């Protein structure tokens, strides 16, 4: 019930992950999305120094904006025009017809997570050459789709969902 009542934003990653393993919340986020809650995500440090492990500078958001002004950044954050990261860079993502596309820094895998359709998600793995882009074909019954990039060090980046 509490998850369904959340609105706006949720933290998908807190840097406390390095200290206690409780910083990644994609399962809760997916549950909220499956219930129809249109919420974005962010990654943060959640830094409480001093700690046993250095947990600063480990989570952030990258905003898609043509302008570097306070008003533009806030408007794009409110619109969900950003991705959250703990390492990988996502340079482009979106939907073109029935395909979801993503380009990124070299990755070990790209996960496309789709809502509303059993079996609608897909993982693309790096084999021989660096994995820097992925395409996922929509099947027609999805209500939303998002992507997750995992680099070779296990660090992740998450797009906000695109509602279909």
Q: Where are the model-predicted features located?
A:
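Charged catalytic cores and adjacent phosphate/nucleic-acid-binding surfaces used
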Residues: 11-164
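Single conserved hydrophobic/aromatic residue that forms the stacking wall/gate
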Residues: 1-13
């Amino acid at each position: 019930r509490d998850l369904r009542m959340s609105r706006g934003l949720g933290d998908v990653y807190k840097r406390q992950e390095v200290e206690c393993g409780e910083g990644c919340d994609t399962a809760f986020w997916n549950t909220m999305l499956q219930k129809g809650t249109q919420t974005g995500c962010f990654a943060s440090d959640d830094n409480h120094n001093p700690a046993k492990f250095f947990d600063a500078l480990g989570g952030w958001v990258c905003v898609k904006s043509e302008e570097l002004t306070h008003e533009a950044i806030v408007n794009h954050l409110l619109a969900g025009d950003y991705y959250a990261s703990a390492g990988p860079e996502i340079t482009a993502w979106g939907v073109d017809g029935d395909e979801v596309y993503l380009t990124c820094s070299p990755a070990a895998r790209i996960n496309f997570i789709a809502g509303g359709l059993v079996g609608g998600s897909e993982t693309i793995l790096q084999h021989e050459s660096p994995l820097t882009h992925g395409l996922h074909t929509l099947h027609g019954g999805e209500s939303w789709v998002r992507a997750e990039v995992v680099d070779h060090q296990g660090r992740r980046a998450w797009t906000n969902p695109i509602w279909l």
